[in-house]
Amino acid sequence: EKKGHKPTFPSFKALQWIYLATLDGRELPADVQAANAYLMPLLKKEIKNQSLYEKALTAIILSKTEPKLAAEYVQSLKEYTVYREDMGRYYDTPRAGYSWFDYKIPTQTVAIEAMQRLTPADTETITEMQRWLLQSKRTQAWDTPINSVNAVYAFLQGSNALAPQALSVLKVDEKPLELPKATAAIGYVKTNVPAESKTLTIEKSSEGTSWGAVYAQFMQPS
């Protein structure tokens, strides 16, 4: 402003600062409160011109003071998504942001966080967003420590994912498999099935996203 430029939206660093202060929740010093009081009204200006990452951060910040407006921002975030059964729900727009080392992970994780805070009952959309995040681990990886932490947070926030849950039931040709105890940490299980078996079925009763892999090994007669 000293140079004659009147900002219409907080800078990227200022936006991240307000976000962190919102999450922390502690009372701020008087001078910092004054700075925040200046920045907060700017969050409601020119939001249509901001990236989806910035819109998601803004929704989280406003969730405590203006939940109705924040919910409108989250609805906008949902309207920008596209859905594929195999990939889940994700952003296919330049407004989602992209870089060679981050891919679109930052936008996806902060959008999930905003949805978890403001529309926790919409588990279908959140789960579909998480599915894309998991699929990106396979194809693009979570290449930085920050992306990895944010991705894990996006899966665990607002859920009891680490609580004991019913195990999935594996069946071969409709007959339940008796499985040995899984190895610690990775949950690896090895068992033998008849060579003439045809169909493997996995039945899951717990909530949330589950993932795993099946490896088949056999001896070829000489």
What feature does the model see in each segment?
Residues 2-222:
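Long, domain-scale non-catalytic interaction/scaffolding regions in large secretory-pathway
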